[in-house]
């Protein structure tokens, strides 16, 4: 019966955490996507016949315009002189501000569809998930696209007529991070050139290319690839920018010669930027600021300023005398639609940037009004959806003060006056139209979040219910040893059945998605069980805290609150975690451990471990640190084998020696790979094969050989696990991570011995406060759960895990295997901790899963904290941090649920024996 209860807890816990992990995307980041709108044409008099959209994937704004010293030639110059000359003489320019996640799919969707996908869109992939809403390409006469197979199929396969979009793509094998990235962009220009040449012998193709309303999309992946491989301050990245600039210059001349009409509009921009460490995804300004340069038919020339405008970011651009016009990334879709006179994309929320448009105020006003009405149409459709799903509907307050009809009436009255000669009213009409757009966009957000309060209440009761339910199971199984099933009373069944029916009807009436019903199931289940077991909770709490005075209870309570709050703040400021670790350095003394060597070694290890949360989580490759860590792992393992030689058989000694040899071998192959890649000589085949061979042998064959003749000494088992994962951690380390692995393991080993000593001390004193030790171990274990991540990672950037280490195994871009390797690196410290907690159960002579069950019951206090700390407004860096915090908090709980099972299997039949272990094992 006890096993059934444990199994139920684990299954329910895994399902609960997986589902509630997604709840923030259903509540805070739901897509305002609606269908059934009447589309609005941008203008009846398009200024351009065709448009070229040139996207430098991963190109930063500052790199485009700054004067930069090339790391090889040492020459200081502008990397893009032609684009710069356009800014100075022919173009309007600015910064296009992207939103998070700063990834390729959301960035391209924003600029081409004018629509910000919800944050979860980054998980959809690319080719397999074409965009499921209207786009600028969908509205063109025909689109010719060239570039990456990760981007082009989204819009080709997602078009209303796939034949409307042609795509020329290279194979995935081109995306080799160890080769020149320029070839990726050369492919694009080469195939565009071939298209023009083919048209000279194909009249039908020539006619199609020359028709009005066409778009040409050039996706240039080179900068992104070079940035990931060598960083955005590398010669490779700079050379790629130089190459793009030269090719754009050739392209402009080629287009002018081919069409010969000067009716082509050009847009040059990027989908996202690149961090200093070669990553993107988060809301750091280096990732969200991209260049936007627009020139050609229908586009303004530069506006020169009498008084130069300076700011810290652009001061080195030397463009202070030219007006900079910043836009939101979605505004680009509206601009492109206007330039060739297509409909605004149905779901576009982009605002037409008037500063970029050449033309009269009247023409601008017409296009802007159509833009506003297109967005207003989305609001009306969304409002009808909400009205039809509410018992009572409260109109958006700003539209209650002044309705959309009143706005439109006022604008159209101004237009009539303008047509009658009162041209001075044009700025007022434009201002009012822009105000209507702004209020409409705010109204869309209001409608999208209309049911927030109700569903957030359900989720809150779900978290509180899980905390109480899991703590109740802990008390029942491990404190009271009560495995009997308590059946709910008729009153309990009646109350929760009635409540469930009422809440389900509300969800049904509101036309809620299926997930909302699933969110409701959990709080109903949890609280039904809690109210059926109030006696167990009361008796369990009394037993758990037996022998603890009121004063001690207050001190313990304040300590727990302080640690939990410290952990919450530690998610934002990692140095706080270092302070907590240093404070833990003295707890053995407080608990009565007097051995000087034990205390000194523990203090040194605590200080050493605390240093990792002071280091920059975004790392620069450092082979020396990897080598030092590898040597320490080899020496510590050899020392451990010598110390345990009396307790292990020759068979086990040989296996452990082989594992130490594998660690040395992995260190050798890692060193060869790093040196070769740093010299730009590519990944040596022997190092790649050797790395994979040791990785597979360490993780599969060696554990199997140990399984054939297992040694049940807990120290030997922990050493075996330590050596099993060491090669993986070495090859996946960028700098100090392997050092963390060494010290983190040492910390766990010492912690086990200290708690064992404290238990012996308390048993000698016949102390009746085992609950305090259990609570202390659970709190430290929970804290180490956070250190398992923060020792090498950081939630200030969801992209803080650089791909440098993965190139040593996978030089060609392949997101899923690369992601799997990074996840392996992330999970390994959790596995070590889970094994440590399992051994702690044995050391303290308590039942399996006792400590992890107590940790699981309290860990979601963090999840609930971060659920309410989530931000949907403000800087994208802040928003990204809050999302990452919540995900990490809830995944930590999920990891403990899953990994305690893994840990239990890894520690099967382990005993406390250290000297009685027979060598025949």
Swiss-Prot record:
Q: Give a Gene Ontology cellular component term annotated to this protein.
A: endoplasmic reticulum membrane
How is this protein positioned relative to the membrane? Multi-pass membrane protein
TM annotation in the entry: 10-30, 458-478, 489-509, 517-537, 553-573, 576-596, 600-620, 622-642, 655-675, 685-705, 729-749, 778-798, 820-840, 850-870, 879-899
What Enzyme Commission number does this protein have?
Answer: 2.-.-.-
Q: What is its main location?
A: endoplasmic reticulum
Name the glycosylated positions: 90, 138, 198, 262, 286, 909
InterPro entries, alphabetized:
Alkaline_phosphatase_core_sf, GPI_EtnP_transferase_1, GPI_EtnP_transferase_1_C, Phosphodiest/P_Trfase, PIGN_N
Which Gene3D superfamilies does this chain map to?
Alkaline Phosphatase, subunit A
Instruction: Give ranges for the Cytoplasmic compartment.
Output: 1-9, 479-488, 538-552, 597-599, 643-654, 706-728, 799-819, 871-878
This protein's pathway: Glycolipid biosynthesis; glycosylphosphatidylinositol-anchor biosynthesis
Q: Which GO terms describe its biological process?
A: ATP transport; cell wall organization; GPI anchor biosynthetic process
Q: Which Pfam families match?
A: Phosphodiest (PF01663), PigN (PF04987)
Q: Which GO-annotated molecular functions does the record name?
A: mannose-ethanolamine phosphotransferase activity
Write down the superkingdom of origin: Eukaryota
User: Topological domains (Lumenal): residue ranges?
Assistant: 31-457, 510-516, 574-575, 621, 676-684, 750-777, 841-849, 900-921
Q: Where in the cell is it found?
A: Endoplasmic reticulum membrane
Which PANTHER family does the entry mention? GPI ETHANOLAMINE PHOSPHATE TRANSFERASE 1 (PTHR12250:SF0), PHOSPHATIDYLINOSITOL GLYCAN, CLASS N (PTHR12250)
Q: Which family does it belong to?
A: Belongs to the PIGG/PIGN/PIGO family. PIGN subfamily.
Q: Tell me, what does this protein do in biology?
A: Ethanolamine phosphate transferase involved in glycosylphosphatidylinositol-anchor biosynthesis. Transfers ethanolamine phosphate to the first alpha-1,4-linked mannose of the glycosylphosphatidylinositol precursor of GPI-anchor.
Stated name of the protein: GPI ethanolamine phosphate transferase 1
Q: Which UniProt keywords apply?
A: Cell wall biogenesis/degradation, Endoplasmic reticulum, Glycoprotein, GPI-anchor biosynthesis, Membrane, Transferase, Transmembrane, Transmembrane helix
């Amino acid at each position: 019966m006890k096993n059934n209860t444990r199994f139920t807890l684990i299954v329910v816990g895994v399902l609960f955490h997986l589902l509630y992990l997604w709840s923030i995307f259903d509540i805070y980041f739901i897509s305002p996507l609606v269908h059934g709108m009447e589309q609005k044409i941008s203008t009846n008099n398009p200024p351009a016949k065709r448009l070229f959209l040139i996207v430098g994937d991963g190109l930063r704004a500052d790199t485009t315009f700054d004067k930069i010293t090339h790391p090889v030639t040492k020459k200081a110059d502008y990397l893009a002189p032609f684009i710069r000359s356009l800014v100075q003489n022919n173009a309007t320019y600015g910064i296009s501000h992207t939103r998070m996640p700063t990834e390729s799919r959301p960035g391209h969707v924003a600029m081409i569809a004018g629509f910000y996908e919800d944050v979860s869109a980054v998980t959809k992939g690319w080719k397999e998930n074409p965009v499921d809403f209207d786009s600028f390409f969908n509205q063109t006469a025909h689109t010719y696209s060239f570039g990456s197979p990760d981007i082009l199929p989204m819009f080709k396969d997602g078009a209303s007529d796939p034949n409307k979009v042609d795509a020329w793509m290279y194979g995935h094998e081109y995306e080799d991070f160890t080769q020149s990235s320029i070839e990726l962009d050369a492919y694009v220009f080469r195939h565009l050139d071939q298209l023009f040449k083919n048209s000279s012998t194909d009249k039908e193709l020539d006619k199609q290319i020359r028709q009005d309303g066409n778009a040409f999309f050039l996706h240039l992946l080179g900068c992104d690839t070079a940035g990931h491989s060598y960083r955005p301050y590398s010669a490779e990245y700079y050379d790629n920018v130089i190459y793009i600039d030269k090719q754009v210059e050739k392209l402009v001349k080629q287009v002018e010669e081919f069409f010969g009409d000067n009716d082509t509009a050009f847009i040059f921009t990027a989908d996202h930027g690149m961090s200093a460490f070669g990553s993107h995804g988060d809301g750091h300004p280096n990732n969200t600021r991209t260049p936007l340069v627009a020139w050609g038919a229908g586009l303004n020339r530069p506006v020169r300023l009498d008084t130069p405008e300076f700011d810290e970011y652009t001061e080195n651009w030397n463009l202070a005398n030219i007006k900079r016009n910043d836009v939101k990334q979605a505004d680009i879709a509206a601009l492109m639609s206007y330039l060739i006179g297509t409909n605004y994309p149905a779901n576009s929320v982009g605002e037409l940037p008037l500063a970029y448009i050449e033309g009269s105020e009247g023409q601008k006003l017409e296009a802007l009004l159509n833009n506003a009405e297109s967005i207003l149409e989305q609001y009306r459709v969304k409002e009808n959806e909400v009205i039809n799903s509410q018992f009572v509907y409260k109109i958006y307050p700003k539209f209650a003060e002044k309705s959309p009809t009143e706005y439109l009436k006022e604008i159209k009255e101004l237009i009539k006056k303008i047509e009658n000669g009162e041209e001075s009213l044009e700025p007022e009409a434009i201002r009012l139209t822009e105000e209507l757009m702004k209020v409409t966009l705010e109204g869309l957000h209001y409608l999208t979040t209309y049911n927030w309060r109700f569903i957030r209440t359900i989720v809150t009761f779900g978290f509180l219910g899980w905390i109480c339910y899991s703590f109740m199971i802990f008390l029942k199984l491990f404190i009271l040893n009560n495995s009997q099933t308590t059946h709910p009373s008729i009153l309990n069944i009646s109350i929760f059945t009635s409540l469930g029916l009422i809440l389900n009807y509300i969800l049904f009436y509101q036309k809620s998605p299926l997930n909302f019903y699933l969110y409701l199931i959990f709080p109903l289940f949890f609280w039904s069980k809690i109210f059926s077991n109030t006696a167990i909770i009361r008796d369990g709490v009394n037993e758990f805290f037996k022998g603890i005075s009121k004063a001690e209870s207050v001190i313990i309570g304040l300590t727990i609150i302080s640690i939990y709050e410290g952990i919450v703040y530690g998610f934002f400021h990692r140095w706080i975690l270092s302070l907590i670790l240093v404070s833990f350095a003295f707890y053995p003394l407080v608990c009565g451990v007097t051995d000087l060597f034990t205390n000194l070694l523990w203090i040194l290890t605590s200080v050493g471990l605390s240093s990792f949360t002071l280091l920059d989580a975004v790392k620069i490759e450092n082979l020396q640190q990897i080598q030092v860590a590898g040597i320490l792992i080899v020496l510590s393992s050899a020392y451990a084998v010598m110390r345990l030689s009396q307790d292990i058989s020759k068979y086990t000694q040989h296996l452990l020696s082989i594992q130490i040899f594998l660690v040395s071998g992995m260190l050798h192959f890692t060193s060869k790979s790093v040196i070769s890649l740093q010299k730009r000589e590519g990944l040596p085949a022997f190092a790649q094969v050797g790395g994979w061979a040791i990785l597979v042998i360490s993780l599969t064959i060696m554990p199997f050989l140990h399984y054939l003749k297992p040694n049940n000494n807990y120290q030997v088992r922990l050493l075996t696990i330590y050596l099993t994962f060491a090669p993986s951690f070495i090859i996946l380390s960028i700098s100090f991570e392997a050092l963390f692995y060494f010290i983190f393991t040492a910390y766990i080993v010492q912690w086990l011995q200290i708690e064992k000593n404290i238990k012996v001390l308390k048993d000698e004193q016949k102390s009746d406060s085992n609950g305090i030790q259990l609570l202390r171990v659970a709190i430290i274990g929970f804290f180490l759960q956070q250190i398992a991540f923060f020792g090498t990672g950081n939630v200030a950037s969801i992209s803080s895990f650089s791909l440098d280490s993965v190139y040593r195994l996978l030089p060609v871009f392949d997101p899923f295997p690369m992601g799997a390797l990074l996840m392996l690196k992330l999970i390994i410290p959790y596995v070590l901790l889970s094994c440590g907690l399992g051994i702690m159960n044995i050391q303290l002579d308590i039942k399996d899963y006792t400590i992890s069950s107590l940790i699981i019951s309290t860990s979601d206090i963090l999840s609930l904290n971060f659920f309410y700390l989530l931000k949907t407004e403000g800087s994208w860096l802040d928003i990204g941090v809050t999302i990452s915090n919540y995900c990490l908090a809830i995944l930590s709980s999920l990891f403990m649920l899953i990994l305690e099972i893994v840990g239990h299997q890894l520690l099967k039949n382990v005993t406390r024996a250290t000297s009685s272990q027979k060598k025949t094992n």
